[in-house]
UniProtKB/Swiss-Prot annotation:
Taxonomic classification: Bacteria, Bacillati, Actinomycetota, Actinomycetes, Mycobacteriales
Alphabetized Gene3D superfamilies for the sequence: alpha/beta hydrolase (3.40.50.1820)
EC number: 2.3.1.122, 2.3.1.20
Catalytic activity, reaction form: 2 alpha,alpha'-trehalose 6-mycolate = alpha,alpha'-trehalose 6,6'-bismycolate + alpha,alpha-trehalose; an acyl-CoA + a 1,2-diacyl-sn-glycerol = a triacyl-sn-glycerol + CoA
Record's protein name: Diacylglycerol acyltransferase/mycolyltransferase Ag85B
Catalytic class of the enzyme: transferase
Length: 325
């Protein structure tokens, strides 16, 4: 009887957590959001280009914000969150990232668009409130875009980094798993690290529905489909260790610091994804991983103030790891 009662209580706790998460995710920061930092946008006069890069896979040209780090420079791909806009990348809207990385020897690449995409190749057309389009973001980021940048802007097509917030944190890790020569460095900031497990698929579906009206089943099929496991970083730790991919993993504890981000949605969501990051760290260490920075103990909420601070903090590590000159 005690065992049964314990199971009932545990199940009740899971239901309460799931209900709270389901209520919080849509309409809040949706695995992506957060308030802008005080220093949003870089100063005028920087050599930032607005490229239109053709994508046969997606049947259209994709806007890419770009700042060169010099001929044959390594690249840092800055990936946006669930609520990515079609005008500018969130890293540019909410931080002076181009200014921070000016003359760093690193080319900064910010693809624009891809709301709710997880930067993945979707099974079906991405149909939302604005209509239907083709999402083949993995193909674009790992084939079409690096080839175009190599041919037209002298950017190294290999030895790059992918850094993403929230939704795109897991995407950065997955890109490095399946394309280890291109992405030797992956930065994940405030991501849900086990999206295929537990209530992950359901909660992601709710958030995607709120952020553009998209369906998770159009992306990776039902939760039983292997695509969910393919795109789950926690299930690919052995590959990350074997490839010796350099990792930078950040997640705050849900408590705001002097940086800001003091609002209930951002606090709740950061605390919600935190446990998956702690489990990822434990599994990585158990697998013999030794090439990662884990920043999981500091105060921080699900907001740009903290993601910007992490991008600033990892600059030297990126330069050293990618061989910037």
């Amino acid at each position: 009887m005690t065992d049964v009662s314990g199971k009932i209580r545990a199940w009740g706790r899971r239901l309460l957590v799931g209900a709270a998460a389901a209520a919080a995710l849509p309409g809040l920061v949706g695995l992506a959001g957060g308030a802008a930092t005080a220093g949003a946008f870089s100063r005028p006069g920087l050599p930032v280009e607005y490229l239109q890069v053709p994508s046969a896979a997606m049947g259209r040209s994709i806007k890419v914000q770009f700042q060169s780090g010099g001929d044959n420079s390594p690249a840092v791909y800055l990936l946006d969150g669930l609520r990515a806009q079609d005008d500018y990348n969130g890293w540019d809207i909410n931080t002076p990232a181009f200014e921070w990385y000016y003359q760093s020897g690193l080319s900064v690449i910010m693809p624009v668009g891809g709301q709710s995409s997880f930067y993945s190749d979707w099974y079906s057309p991405a149909c939302g409130k604005a209509g239907c389009t083709t999402y083949k973001w993995e193909t674009f980021l790992t084939s079409e875009l690096p080839q175009w940048l190599s041919a037209n802007r002298s950017v190294k097509p290999t030895g790059s980094a992918a850094v993403g917030i929230s939704m795109a944190g897991s995407s950065a890790l997955i890109l490095s798993v399946y394309h280890p020569q291109q992405f030797i460095y992956a930065g994940s900031l405030s991501a849900l690290m086990d999206p295929s497990q537990g209530m992950g698929p359901s909660l992601i579906g709710l958030a995607m529905g709120d952020a553009g009206g998209y369906k998770a089943s159009d992306m990776w099929g039902p939760s039983s489909d292997p695509a969910w496991q393919r795109n789950d970083p926690s299930l690919h730790i052995p590959e990350l260790v074997a490839n010796n991919t350099r990792l930078w993993i950040y997640c705050g504890n849900g408590t705001p610091s002097e940086l800001g981000g003091a609002n209930v949605p951002a606090e709740f969501l950061e605390n919600f994804v935190r446990s998956s990051n702690l489990k990822f760290q434990d599994a990585y260490n158990a697998a013999g991983g030794h090439n990662a920075v884990f920043n999981l103990d500091a105060n921080g909420t699900h907001s740009w103030e903290y993601w910007g601070a992490q991008l600033n903090a990892m600059k030297g590590d990126l330069q050293a790891s990618l061989g910037a000159r």
